[in-house]
Curated annotation (Swiss-Prot):
Its EC number is 5.1.3.31. This is L-ribulose 3-epimerase. GO terms for molecular function: isomerase activity; metal ion binding. Substrate binds at residues 153, 180-183, 212. It catalyses: L-ribulose = L-xylulose; keto-D-tagatose = keto-D-sorbose; D-allulose = keto-D-fructose. Homotetramer. Optimum temperature is around 60 degrees Celsius. The enzyme is stable below 60 degrees Celsius. It can also use Fe(2+). Strongly inhibited by Co(2+) and Ni(2+), and slightly inhibited by EDTA. Optimum pH is 8. The enzyme is stable between 7 and 10. Its cofactor is Mn(2+).
Length: 297
């Protein structure tokens, strides 16, 4: 059964303990099954206390990051690449210690606009580094899920097909795709077909609107997306992601160009998203049942 989650920045960008606890309480109140924490620094957090609170509320947890430029594992600078591996290993440990089993986000290269096309050497350095991190993650009971993002946030992996090729080159069975409807709407020729093509290798999904606001108010064909996820038998985690200038994280807001205030009432946004995703999945399942029913007299 799919767990429906929510990105922590819908609630707060702070790592203060009181804010983290409020984030968890809001997540449960809005009806979600999972919280996705992003850019959570273990040095700032009571990990044991947070893990207990997550468990007490019956929530799942995932951790997402975007590698910084000075931690780009595809870099030819060995110190920079080594820092990236260190960040990834720390994130794996954090995920394990919080009781999670998925690391997601931009793991293959530095997050941000690149002014040059990627090189084969860059690709090879990244696949080799992630293959090693994936083994560490596997021992910790954690999977790596590569977010496929638009060309303005990475030059390495922009389509699901590129992600599949990348995973194949790592040789790892512990690396999967993290698909995001916002990014797919920009880069994929057909989002539904891309999902079908990636069947069996999808490990995590972000559900977000074309303008990153309320679901259903942009131009994304969510019915086609839910139909495709149902068709490939995806029954794993989906998390709602939305950003507004109402809640700003300096590390992420500039890289993702969050200039407009698309919402102010985050609880209304979250409850709407939970209902929208739940109904979308249920509708897709019911349609699949109808088209497969033979109805013999």
């Amino acid at each position: 059964m799919a767990r429906i989650g929510i990105h922590s920045f819908v609630w707060s960008a702070s790592s203060a303990q009181s804010e983290l606890e409020r984030t968890l309480a809001n997540t449960r109140e809005a009806g979600f099954d999972l919280i996705e924490f992003s850019y959570l620094d273990p040095a700032d957090v009571d990990i044991g206390g947070l893990a207990k609170r997550i468990a007490d509320l019956g929530l799942g947890v995932a951790i997402s990051i975007g590698l910084p430029g000075d931690g780009d594992i595809s870099s030819a600078d060995k110190a920079v690449a080594a820092r990236g591996v260190e960040i990834l290993n720390e994130t794996v440990a954090l995920t394990r210690d919080l009781g999670g089993r998925k690391v997601a986000g931009i793991l293959s290269a530095g997050h941000g606009l690149q002014l040059e096309a990627p090189t084969r050497d860059q690709w090879s350095r990244s696949t080799a580094a992630l293959a090693k991190v994936a083994e560490t993650a596997k021992a910790a009971g954690v999977t790596l899920n590569l977010e496929i993002v638009n060309r303005f946030e990475s030059n390495l992996l922009n389509t699901a097909a590129q992600g599949l090729a990348f995973i194949e080159d790592t040789g790892s069975d512990n690396i999967f795709l993290h698909l995001d409807t916002f990014h797919m709407n920009i880069e994929e020729a057909d989002v539904g077909l891309a999902i079908r093509h990636a069947a069996g290798k999808i490990g995590y999904v972000h559900i977000g609107e074309s303008h990153r606001g309320f679901l259903g108010t942009g131009n994304i064909d969510f019915a086609a997306i839910f139909d495709a996820l149902t068709a490939v038998g995806y029954a794993d985690d989906l998390s709602f992601e939305s950003f507004s200038s109402e809640i700003v994280d300096e590390n992420l807001s500039k890289k993702t160009a969050i200039w407009r205030n698309l919402w102010a009432d985050n609880m209304a946004l979250a409850k709407h998203a939970r209902a929208f995703i739940g109904l979308g999945l249920e509708t897709a399942r019911r349609k699949a049942e109808l088209v497969s029913a033979r109805h013999k007299p």
